Amino acid sequence: MEDTSRCIDDVLKIGQQEKEIRQAEFSDAQGEREEVKCIDYTVDLEAGLPRHESSGKSNTLKQCYNAVLGFLEELIIVIIIVLLLYSLTMVGLFYVMTMTKFLF
């Protein structure tokens, strides 16, 4: 009998949670992003991340660290691309110089 009442309570809780989810409030924060609030859990719809990992303006040390690492990764990629283009240009110039030397 206790198991049956527990199951009924669980089903009622799940039903209540589904009802609260259906009645989620959409709010527009300064016209920049939308958030869904439901059962003390907020999701940033723009980024699809939970609030504590949201793309909002939160100055935590971890976010600053991640931003710096991201910047360094992008910088390294740009430097590698520039060096590849430079080396290809130098190889091309060397080829043109040697060909003109042989032809003329």
From Swiss-Prot:
Keywords: Membrane, Transmembrane, Transmembrane helix, Vacuole
Record protein name field: Phosphate metabolism protein 6
Superkingdom of the source species: Eukaryota
Coiled coil: none
Organism name: Saccharomyces cerevisiae (strain ATCC 204508 / S288c) (Baker's yeast)
GO CC terms: fungal-type vacuole; vacuolar membrane
Membrane-topology annotation of the record: Single-pass membrane protein
GO terms classed as biological process: phosphate ion transport
Induction per the UniProt record: Regulated by phosphate levels.
Keyword Transport: no
Membrane-spanning segments: 76-96
UniProt KW Aminoacyl-tRNA synthetase keyword: no
Localization of this protein: Vacuole membrane
